[in-house]
A protein has these predicted regions:
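N-terminal leader segment of winged-helix/HTH proteins
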Residues: 1-34
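Active-site phosphate/pyrophosphate-handling residues
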Residues: 11-14, 42, 57, 130
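Charged, amphipathic alpha-helical coiled-coil/dimerization segments
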Residues: 24, 75-134
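C-terminal regulatory/oligomerization modules of transcriptional regulators
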Residues: 1-5, 126-142
Length: 142
């Protein structure tokens, strides 16, 4: 199957798929962690950006089961990446926050992400990158 060279005739889906594949390959070749998958790193990174998260927040955000997130949080806790504490406003909820080790781990990932973004945007102007970010933000808010 050949693709039309006119970008207007190609689905956005195709570009997203290509970017995901490109990032996955870059991640695999630049981070050698047998303990965390790319998906698991995404969850760890989200906890970092949120500052504090709940299990429910993560289930909703990643559209996965509560059991999956519970198992993953246990793994993160066992590896020393997160700490959980009781929510003072609702004692049934646990608040999740990165430890110093979790911050160190995500720092390494952020560096890889930045290097990949620099690579894929090398031929794009700062204005185009800004526009791309604005458009992607709008798309993800739907």
């Amino acid at each position: 199957m050949t693709f039309d060279e006119n970008p207007e005739n190609i689905f956005i889906y195709h570009y997203v798929e290509e970017l995901i594949s490109s990032y996955g390959s870059y991640y695999e070749s630049n981070l050698n962690y047998n303990d965390l998958t790319l998906k698991e790193f995404s969850v760890l990174l989200r906890i970092r950006f949120q500052g504090v998260a709940t299990q429910h927040d993560l289930v909703e955000l990643f559209k996965v089961s509560g059991a999956y997130i519970a198992k993953l949080l246990r793994k993160f806790e066992d590896n020393g990446y997160i700490a959980r504490k009781e929510d003072p406003e609702n004692r049934r909820k646990k608040l999740v926050k990165l430890t110093d080790e979790g911050i160190k781990k995500t720092d390494e990932l952020i560096e890889v992400i930045q290097n990949w973004e620099d690579k894929v945007t090398a031929g794009i102007s700062e204005d185009e990158i800004k526009t791309l970010n604005e458009i992607l933000f709008k798309i993800t808010m739907i």
